[in-house]
């Protein structure tokens, strides 16, 4: 949703936006129209990156750690070499769990930021 709009407005050539929630998909499509980004953002209802074959330079996700852990393998598979996986929505108590899974998969942790009880991680393939 908002991450795809922001990515496009910040210069991404094309954005593929996936969400499981039908309401979120409809909202993203409406916001895409409001921001005149129809040709720049493809919006689909999907369960994380399951069965997605599209490669990306950057994958951005703002979801809870438990769901993020399920996404890491597919994120690796869908990133080009040296691509970035930017995650947020991780509660501090789950930070090490997520970071360890990223490292185990082969990601290099580039940056970690914490604000209050929330963590974001930038990892590179």
Predicted regions and their residues:
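Core SAM-dependent methyltransferase catalytic element
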Residues: 107-125
């Amino acid at each position: 949703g908002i991450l795809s709009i922001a990515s496009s407005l910040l210069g991404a050539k094309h954005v593929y936006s996936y969400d499981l929630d039908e309401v979120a998909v409809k909202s993203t499509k409406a916001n895409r129209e409001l921001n005149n980004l129809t040709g720049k953002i493809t919006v689909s209802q999907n369960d994380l990156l399951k069965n997605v074959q599209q490669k990306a330079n950057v994958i951005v996700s703002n979801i809870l750690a438990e769901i993020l852990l399920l996404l890491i393998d597919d994120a690796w598979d869908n990133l080009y070499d040296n691509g970035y996986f930017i995650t947020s929505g991780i509660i501090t108590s789950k930070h090490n769990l997520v970071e360890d899974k990223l490292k185990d998969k082969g990601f290099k942790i580039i940056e970690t930021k914490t604000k209050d009880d929330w963590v974001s991680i930038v990892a590179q393939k």
